[in-house]
Amino acid sequence: MSRAFVNEDAGGEARRFVLPRRDDPSFDAAAARVLLRGADEGDSASAEAATGYVFGEPKLRPHVERILAEAQAAGDERLEQLAERFLRRGAR
């Protein structure tokens, strides 16, 4: 098989995200943060797999709106940008 199709040199194992149990009331808030962190790290696929939600999930909108307000208050422009992108995607 051609080396072009072999990924033996890929680094490390899959990302691990710490989340509460799915039936925990704080799961959705934690999932929103994980999705934003995954996007920031260029690994949305792993974050989506870990949470069961896609980036822009409308159900997470209230949590992301809170994160956006926190980011604006803290002057965290990158998190603000990601939260705004999440909210735009969910509005489609």
Where do the PLM segments sit?
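Amphipathic alpha-helical binding modules
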Residues: 69-92
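Long, non-catalytic architectural segments outside compact domain cores
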Residues: 1-63, 85-92
